[in-house]
Amino acid sequence: MQRTGLLLLLIASLVSPLLCSAEQGRVLKLDGNWKVEHVYVDEDSTSTNLMALISDDPTLRGRIFEFTPDKIKTSIPTASRCELPDYVSMDVTSINSLMSGTTEVQLSDPAKSYALPVKGTLDIRPYRIHCQNGAISPSDEHSEHWLVKLDEESIFLNWDNQSYLLLKKLADNATLQPSFACARATSDSEKTICHDSDLSSWDVSVAEAYNVALKQIVNTGVDVKSRSVELRKTQKRWLDERNACFVNPACLKKKMQDRVDELVELAKQ
């Protein structure tokens, strides 16, 4: 009987953490799709690592995170897939204290430096994310990832290159719209984009990246007219190339992802 009791205690000690972790996932109510609403970076930092991303970077903004009990999957091209995620409750702390552990440079007020929509003194309970298999992001093996449920519709998550993401909950069966009016779509490529939420989100990202690149040209004040004209010409040529994909979703997605990368790099100059 004594041995049986010890065996049961041993089993309970092994199973209990798993049950607690699963319970944390249910308490957090993460199941469903979440859209990257904002990308926060410290634009004043001189760190070359931070130049990998820009504020509200179109490569990340608009992407989808899918949370289920079995996985965390995202449409971010370079991201991995986190299988059997555990959410480990951390001590209550302030936003600033939490961010200080994941920023390269010590900032007096990280929330302010990153222009977050909340005060750095806000007390929150973060949850450390542990993937039993796989990873959330490309650098997951080198950094710790956590999330904060700001409210029922908002998640604050640390990401790569010392960036932070604000995720917004999507309604069940929500469909994403492209940057153009689908009612006026004429080409095969536009019609294909209109019928695919992922392609639609990338179309929006192309439009946002184009506007960011154009704004950067204007902000430099150097050869604004000629460079703006050249940007419009290259965008027109790219649209012709995109339309050559016709109804091929993989081709359309690749074209749009590559164009977003090109425009974001231009915006960094």
What are these regions (language model features)?
Residues 7-17:
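Bacterial N-terminal signal peptides
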Residues 33-35:
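A short tyrosine-centered beta-strand micro-motif
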Residues 63-66, 145-150:
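Short, exposed beta-strand/loop patches in secreted or surface proteins that constitute
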